[in-house]
Amino acid sequence: MTSATPQPGQLIVITGPSGVGKGTLLRQLRQRHPELALSVSATTRPPRPTEVAGVDYYFVSVEEFKAMIAAGQLLEWAEFAGHYYGTPRQPLVQLIAQGKTVILEIELQGARQVRQSYPQARHIFILPPSLAELEHRLRSRGQDSEEAIARRLAQAETEIAAAPEFDVQIVNDDLEKSLIALETAIFSPAP
């Protein structure tokens, strides 16, 4: 009797402006679907109060991050809001080879890199109902300076303009509706 080879998994790339609610959607999604694997990104930004190293991000120094780039250890990487973010390649590849559906939450530049290096990934863009609502969400987090909020809003306009590049766009105006749309996008057969 031979053991079955696991079927390859899939990579789901989720992108959207800062403050659009990606984290909230993904937390809810993982509660409903614990079988989904979340890719853990590396970043040079400091941890937020509720974040756990190795779970939410791998928090590394700029020097460590640059060494990862030089060694080809990142599937994608980008600089955003003054910090580096990137996806360690090996853990992601291992999970997909094990048949897992892996969720990769990254920003636009990284998503574009993944489209080039891993074209079979499904790309989902989360949109805010409006820029005014996005600004409200950013301010209500209470963690960014006025300058950072202005930078994030300017970046959001650029990112929103790129939404048509994605396989699926979801407007996050109602958590439950958005979650159902996200589930549909992830679990429906690829077109």
Curated annotation (Swiss-Prot):
Residues 9-187 form the Guanylate kinase-like domain. Keywords: ATP-binding, Cytoplasm, Kinase, Nucleotide-binding, Transferase. It is found in: Cytoplasm. Disulfide bonds: none annotated. One of its GO terms (molecular function) is guanylate kinase activity. Essential for recycling GMP and indirectly, cGMP. CDD domains: GMPK. This is Guanylate kinase. GO terms for cellular component: cytosol. Pfam families: Guanylate_kin (PF00625). SMART domains: GuKc (SM00072). Its EC number is 2.7.4.8. It catalyses: GMP + ATP = GDP + ADP. InterPro entries: GK/Ca_channel_bsu, Guanylate_kin-like_dom, Guanylate_kinase, Guanylate_kinase_CS, P-loop_NTPase. Belongs to the guanylate kinase family. ATP binds at residues 16-23.
